[in-house]
Structure formats: structure tokens, C-alpha cells
Amino acid sequence: MPVIQVNLTKGRTPEQLQALGEALTAAVEESIAAPRASIRVLITECDPEHFFIGGETIADLRASGRR
């Protein structure tokens, strides 16, 4: 049972998340011939203040125009 975990900052629409889940499922199904019903996709969204890159939050990077 393949499990794909995706961590994103908040801000995407339910339709975008649905499309991502469908695309990831299709990619796993095609690439490793996993049965579609066995593929799990877990999307976790977090606040930009809780997601760090190089010790700085995404919120700070966006505010400074560096992200």
C-alpha cells in the first residue's frame, strides 16, 4: 500500500488539493503498477509561520520578497 505524504503551506483551494491528490495517485499507479484502490495520499497544510526554510519562516521569506 503506497502512502504519499505532502506538506504544504495553507492557501490552496479544495479543487487544487483534489487535483494534486488525483495526479499523485495516477503517477504512482502508472509508475509502479500499484492498484489504484491501495494508494493513499495524505496532504497536510500548515501555516506559513510554521514552515521553515533555512531557519526562516515562509511568511518572512514571502514578506521580504524572497519567496
Language-model features, listed with the residues they occupy:
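A domain-level signal for the structural core that forms small-molecule/cofactor-binding pockets
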Residues: 1-67
